[in-house]
């Protein structure tokens, strides 16, 4: 799926707004490969509303955004990670894999801040 991210990128707006979980998963997969600040909050909300498999991949997309957008969009990424955490905190069951990925995303941002101080 990720190998076609560049080819399918032009369909991202359509995939994001789709009622089909498969198409939303395709959008998430594209954003895992090609992070876009426009969709950070959309990804953060997927953590709350999608089934665990899809929500996990939304968290991975946020982790990749933290790694790739931290220099240009650190505040937006931080806000999205915070929203994802809030959504996860409201969930009846917290997927340990999602928790781990979001913790790593937060560490990525903090690492960048610490590197900038040195």
Regions picked out by a protein language model, each given a short descriptive name:
Residues 1-3, 14, 22-35, 45, ...:
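Structural detector for internal amphipathic alpha-helices that build alpha-solenoid repeat scaffolds
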Residues 4-15, 36-47, 68-83, 115-118:
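Amphipathic alpha-helical scaffolding segments comprising HEAT/armadillo-like alpha-solenoid repeats
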Residues 15-19, 47-51, 85-89:
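Alpha-solenoid helical repeat architecture
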Residues 78-118:
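Eukaryotic acidic, Ser/Thr-rich intrinsically disordered low-complexity regions
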